[in-house]
């Protein structure tokens, strides 16, 4: 998205509404990259493993819903045009993850969390509030959030059996992308959050993971 393009408040509202619909409606997010799972064979999974992996992928899908909302909220209140553009571009990249996770959840015979609209609204508000404080805080929040996501992905990869190469391929590529997003945010001047703040974010993230594993 061009940094020199100017939008009216109504334009921005419509763009935000479009983003919310693309994030929350089933099959509405179109990935720019094909899923890494496409080239991987189907592995034989027990019924118990299938349910567990579906729960983990549902958590990851909701995490991507939160990331979309966070970026969109921040882009709405970012002060510098280049920061706003960076947020919008990052949100577009996260669409890939959103679509990949949903595809895999459906393949495992399950569905995304019904709590997604709630978490979208909460994350959008947090992102907008961070942007109102300062661009540096906003970028720092991105870095800290992506660091938390990487930890969750590592935990999930440790639980997913090697036989499920499709799910593992998705999460491995997501981890690469999320780590890059964190590095980009810090390189752009993001504030490095202190450990107590990160701990608080981690505790809040546990609320999301516990609630969306099954519903």
UniProtKB/Swiss-Prot annotation:
Signal peptide: none annotated. GO terms for molecular function: 3-demethoxyubiquinol 3-hydroxylase activity; metal ion binding; monooxygenase activity. InterPro entries: COQ7_proteobact, Ferritin-like, Ferritin-like_SF, Ubq_synth_Coq7. Fe cation 2 binds at residues 94, 146, 178, 181. GO terms for biological process: ubiquinone biosynthetic process. One of its GO terms (cellular component) is membrane. The keyword Translocase does not apply. Keywords: Cell membrane, Iron, Membrane, Metal-binding, Monooxygenase, Oxidoreductase, Ubiquinone biosynthesis. Its main location: membrane. Pathway: Cofactor biosynthesis; ubiquinone biosynthesis. It is found in: Cell membrane. It is a peripheral membrane protein. Pfam families: COQ7 (PF03232). It comes from the Bacteria. It catalyses: a 5-methoxy-2-methyl-3-(all-trans-polyprenyl)benzene-1,4-diol + AH2 + O2 = a 3-demethylubiquinol + A + H2O. Binds 2 iron ions per subunit. The keyword Membrane applies. Its cofactor is Fe cation. Its EC number is 1.14.99.60. SUPFAM superfamilies: Ferritin-like. Fe cation 1 binds at residues 64, 94, 97, 178. Belongs to the COQ7 family. Catalyzes the hydroxylation of 2-nonaprenyl-3-methyl-6-methoxy-1,4-benzoquinol during ubiquinone biosynthesis. This is 3-demethoxyubiquinol 3-hydroxylase. It comes from Pseudomonas aeruginosa (strain ATCC 15692 / DSM 22644 / CIP 104116 / JCM 14847 / LMG 12228 / 1C / PRS 101 / PAO1). The gene is coq7.
């Amino acid at each position: 998205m061009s940094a020199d393009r100017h939008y009216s408040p109504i334009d921005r509202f419509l763009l935000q509404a479009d983003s919310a619909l693309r994030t929350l409606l089933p099959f509405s997010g179109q990935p720019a990259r094909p899923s890494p799972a496409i080239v991987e064979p189907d592995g034989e999974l027990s019924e118990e493993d299938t349910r567990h992996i579906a729960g983990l992928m549902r958590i990851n899908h909701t995490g991507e819903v939160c990331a979309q909302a966070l970026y969109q909220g921040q882009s709405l209140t970012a002060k510098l045009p280049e920061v706003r553009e960076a947020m919008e571009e990052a949100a577009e990249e996260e669409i890939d993850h959103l679509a990949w996770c949903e595809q895999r959840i459906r393949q495992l015979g399950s569905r995304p969390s019904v709590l997604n609209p709630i978490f979208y609204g909460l994350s959008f508000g947090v992102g907008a509030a961070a942007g109102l404080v300062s661009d540096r805080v906003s970028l720092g929040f991105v870095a800290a959030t992506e660091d938390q996501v990487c930890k969750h992905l590592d935990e999930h990869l440790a639980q997913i059996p090697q036989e499920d190469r499709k799910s593992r391929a998705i999460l491995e590529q997501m981890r690469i992308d999320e780590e890059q997003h964190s590095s980009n945010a810090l390189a752009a001047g993001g504030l490095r959050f202190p450990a107590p703040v990160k701990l608080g974010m981690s505790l809040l993230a546990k609320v999301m993971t516990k609630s969306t594993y099954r519903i």
